[in-house]
């Protein structure tokens, strides 16, 4: 999860988020090189005593500054398109969970089970236990099995919301009357925190999301205890 004064992304815990981090580093390197080149050229222009007032055209330079940016854009666009297609890919999910946004809490339904659903509210600051996180803890966590493909169906009962968990590279809009879907898979167990990422009213900041990723055998025990 995030920590105070953090500058980078949260640690990736899903293949998609790992791809997004690699793409971010790849793009940032290109932007840094371009910025350095532009600053270098500007510094030369400001410090040189040479002038070229008689130069009318320079086709070679024009060709270079047309082709080079096109190549750079292609180098950025190709990996970006690859990740976009990966994010929309659905691979026979092992479990489906329906998420509904409300003002101002989330409700979850495990559609593969006959009667497994619950609401998830933020725990008020006055009721937190030692070690728990302010504005991020909930009374009912979403328990999911790790290393399995899980489909999340996301919608809303009232206004626009957005279901987002940064460590998993997830952000899906919850739109009234529309059912969006996304897939997730965690490569390691743990608690992963998120929040509503669409301004939805006065208590928008009080809609945390907590995923608890556990091995399959522990998930089966939990689901049996909830039925």
Swiss-Prot record:
Q: What is the lineage of its organism?
A: Eukaryota, Metazoa, Chordata, Craniata, Vertebrata
Under which name does UniProt file this protein? Cytochrome c oxidase subunit 2
Q: Name one Pfam family in it.
A: COX2_TM
What EC number is given for this enzyme?
7.1.1.9
Q: Note whether Magnesium occurs among the keywords.
A: yes
Which residues does the record give as Mg(2+) binding sites?
Answer: 198
What membrane topology does the UniProt entry give?
Multi-pass membrane protein
Supply one GO molecular-function term. copper ion binding
Which coenzyme or cofactor does it need? Cu cation
Keyword list (alphabetical) reads: Copper, Electron transport, Magnesium, Membrane, Metal-binding, Mitochondrion, Mitochondrion inner membrane, Phosphoprotein, Respiratory chain, Translocase, Transmembrane, Transmembrane helix, Transport
Question: Per UniProt, where does Cu cation A2 bind?
Answer: 196, 198, 200, 204
Q: Superkingdom, according to UniProt?
A: Eukaryota
Per the UniProt entry, what is one GO biological process? ATP synthesis coupled electron transport
Q: Where are the transmembrane segments?
A: 15-45, 60-87
């Amino acid at each position: 999860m995030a920590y105070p004064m953090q500058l980078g992304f949260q640690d990736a815990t899903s293949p998609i988020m790992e791809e997004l981090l690699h793409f971010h580093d790849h793009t940032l390197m290109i932007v840094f090189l371009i910025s350095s080149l532009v600053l270098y050229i500007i510094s030369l222009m400001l410090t040189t005593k040479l002038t070229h007032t008689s130069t009318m055209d320079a086709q070679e330079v024009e060709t270079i500054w047309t082709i080079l940016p096109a190549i750079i854009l292609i180098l950025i666009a190709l990996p970006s398109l690859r990740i976009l297609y990966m994010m929309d890919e659905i691979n026979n999910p092992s479990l489906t969970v329906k998420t509904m946004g409300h003002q101002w809490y989330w409700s979850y339904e495990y559609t593969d089970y006959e009667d497994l659903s619950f609401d998830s509210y933020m725990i008020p600051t006055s009721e937190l236990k030692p070690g728990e996180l302010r504005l991020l803890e909930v009374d009912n966590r979403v328990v999911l099995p790790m290393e399995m493909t899980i489909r999340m169906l996301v919608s809303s009962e009232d206004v626009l919301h957005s279901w987002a968990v940064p460590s998993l590279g997830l952000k899906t809009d919850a739109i009234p009357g529309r059912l969006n879907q996304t897939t997730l898979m965690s490569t390691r167990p743990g608690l992963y925190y998120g929040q509503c990422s669409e301004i939805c009213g006065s208590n928008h900041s009080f809609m945390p999301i907590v995923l608890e990723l556990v091995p399959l055998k522990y998930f089966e025990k939990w689901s049996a205890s909830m039925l």
